[in-house]
Swiss-Prot record:
Zn(2+) 3 binds at C540, C543, H555, C559. DNA-dependent metalloendopeptidase that mediates the proteolytic cleavage of covalent DNA-protein cross-links (DPCs) during DNA synthesis, thereby playing a key role in maintaining genomic integrity. DPCs are highly toxic DNA lesions that interfere with essential chromatin transactions, such as replication and transcription, and which are induced by reactive agents, such as UV light or formaldehyde. Associates with the DNA replication machinery and specifically removes DPCs during DNA synthesis. GO terms for biological process: DNA damage response; protein autoprocessing; protein-DNA covalent cross-linking repair; proteolysis. Zn(2+) 1 binds at H88, H92, H107. Zn(2+) 2 binds at C439, C442, H454, C458. A motif (SHP-box) lies at residues 231-239. It comes from Xenopus laevis. The lineage of its organism: Eukaryota, Metazoa, Chordata, Craniata, Vertebrata. This is DNA-dependent metalloprotease SPRTN. Its cofactor is Zn(2+). Signal peptide: none annotated. Belongs to the Spartan family. It is an enzyme of class 3 (hydrolase).
Length: 565
């Protein structure tokens, strides 16, 4: 048969592929007989079409062309009839998509030309009309008989047979002619077995409700999901104020019972802060106030009470709840230390030396809390009391990409009680007229009260987003951490720290080494080849523990790993 080894209508296909995939057949026939021009045509089964074996519909130029095959008729016929019906409809589709549909009756010369071409190549018997009359009559279960003269006329003898329960009416195109020539009325004489019972069962709301509930298993209408899927864990109930810090444990909630039943409260687990120390629950204590008994929601958004640790809310210690400057991921956390000017200048108000953290491991969203002696930092807010000796807690958040360490280079003796109790002369803004501070831009010593004007002059070239601060610190008070460095070098150590208006800073302070003491500044007591002192202890910025200076790097690595876990 040409280029094919076996005819598409060969009887062997009945055993090899009795139920073929019509989409696979369509693609194969499109490439073999129709030059691949039907790739945009749709082919599918139709479960309701019982009058004809196939239909090809076209929505016009550029529209959808669809082929539908009758599943009720073709499933009772041999495979050969399915193939011939599909080829028949594909010829119609070819005439549609190539705009060659000149045949007004759809089966004219153009159709017959392609039909004969395919029949000659395949040995098929594609015809104009099908002969599945027995199958069509099998699905016509609803019969009506006319009581007029037309019941004696050929070919129908007054019968109207249909597959659906639709009585003859004026909607039929032949109704007007029947009324004029016969004038009789139609009476239903036959319908499928048990059809009234099926119709009654379908229209009965009680039966349909029972059937719907029996068929759809596990589906609940208006029922709490917690009754279908029991929840035995702990959690917080949304949109309801919690009366305790403890998580709510929901047990056996039945929505049909009294609504006054509330979820049982599980025992309160001990909360921990970021340093790993346990915090006590003060609800119900003798010192609790009505405001404390009704707490806000447990959320990382409430930065006054909780901090964000890897997405989990951790309660802050009670001593830092009332502080106005709490943990923040933006630069608002360092505003108490630096007062931003309009031209990106800073008012540096930290006179104490600091110890540089040597750990360079990037940590994400880790908050450090450390205590700074308030005596060494005069308050910069208007109206604040300089005699306040309460420790100042500052919580600064360190980000892996936006973390900087600022070393203060002011040589004020932090152990001098006279200079710690209060400034010699302060203005209403809290600035001292006698203390000189070092300009972070040019390094010149300027009076503290005039540092802002001096910074404006230094940066008068124009607003800059990135400003480099040169902070000169004596090398002897801050031993170098690099291997093989010489501790006897007297040259000042300059650190370039870039300050961005969107970055956050970590300021390490609290080193009580007297920078004015020449003995301590000339040479450390005992140093190793790496520059660390074996006798000086430094405070860990993470947990606050005093650790030997040469052990601080290992201790910081351990603390940071514990924070992550």
């Amino acid at each position: 048969m040409g280029d094919m080894q076996m005819s598409v209508v060969d009887p062997t296909w009945e055993l090899l592929d009795p139920n073929p995939d019509i989409r696979a057949l369509f693609l194969e026939f499109n490439d073999t007989f129709f030059w691949g021009q039907l790739s945009g045509v749709e082919v599918k089964w139709s479960a309701r079409m019982t009058l004809c074996a196939g239909v090809c519909s076209y929505e016009g130029r550029g529209g959808l062309c669809s082929i539908r095959l009758s599943e009720p008729l073709l499933k009772l016929r041999p495979r050969k009839d399915l193939v011939e019906t599909l080829l028949h409809e594909m010829i119609h589709a070819l005439l549609f998509v190539t705009h060659n549909n000149k045949d007004h009756d759809s089966h004219g010369p153009e159709f017959c030309k392609h039909m004969e071409r395919i029949n000659g190549r395949t040995g098929a018997n594609i015809s104009v009309y099908h002969n599945f009359h027995d199958e069509v009559d099998e699905y016509r279960k609803h019969w009506w008989l006319c009581n007029g003269p037309c019941q004696k006329r050929k070919p129908y003898f007054g019968y109207v047979k249909r597959a659906m329960n639709r009585a003859p009416s004026s909607l039929d195109p032949w109704w007007a002619d029947h009324q004029r020539t016969c004038g009789g009325s139609f009476v239903k004489v036959k319908e499928p077995e048990n059809y009234p019972q099926k119709r009654k069962r379908k229209n009965d709301p009680t039966i349909s409700e029972v059937n719907s509930s029996s068929h759809v298993k596990g589906k609940s209408n208006g029922v709490d999901i917690r009754t279908v899927i029991p929840f035995s864990g702990t959690g917080y109930k949304l949109f309801e104020p919690n009366k305790s810090d403890a998580p709510l444990k929901i047990l056996n909630i039945n929505p049909t019972k009294d609504k006054a039943a509330v979820p049982l409260l599980n025992h309160t687990p001990p909360s921990t802060n970021i340093n790993g120390t346990f915090l006590t629950n003060k609800i119900g204590s003798a010192k609790s106030t009505p405001a404390q008994s009704i707490l806000t929601k447990v959320s990382v958004a409430n930065t006054k009470v909780f901090i964000n640790l890897n997405g989990s809310p951790i309660k802050l210690p009670s001593g830092s709840k009332n502080k106005s400057h709490q943990i923040s991921s933006k630069q608002k956390s360092v505003l108490p230390f630096f007062k931003m000017q309009k031209d990106n200048s800073f008012d540096l108000t930290l006179p104490s030396p600091s110890i540089q953290s040597t750990s360079q491991k990037p940590q994400k969203d880790i908050s450090f809390g450390f205590t700074l002696p308030s005596q060494s930092f005069p308050s910069t807010s208007p109206g604040s009391n300089s005699e306040n000796k309460e420790p100042l807690y500052k919580k600064l958040q360190m980000n892996d990409r936006e973390s900087f360490i600022i070393h203060s280079g002011n040589k004020t003796n932090v152990n001098d009680n006279k200079s710690c109790t209060g400034p010699a002369a302060t203005t209403a803004s809290g600035l001292n007229h006698t203390i000189k501070v070092s300009c972070p831009v040019c390094g010149t010593e300027v009076l503290e009260c005039k540092i802002n004007d001096h910074l404006d002059t230094c940066t008068s070239s124009g607003p800059q987003k990135d400003i480099l601060l040169d902070v000169s610190l004596p090398l002897q008070s801050f031993p170098s951490t690099s291997q093989g460095s010489n501790s006897a070098i007297k040259e000042p150590l300059y650190k370039k720290l870039q300050i961005n208006d969107k970055d956050s800073f970590i300021i390490h302070s609290g080193n009580k080494t007297n920078v004015n003491d020449n003995k301590s500044c000339t040479r450390p007591a005992a140093t190793t080849a790496s520059g660390f002192n074996h006798t000086i202890k430094v405070c860990c910025p993470v947990c606050g523990t005093d650790v030997l200076q040469d052990k601080i790097n290992d201790h910081l690595d351990t603390c940071l790993q514990n924070c992550n876990t």
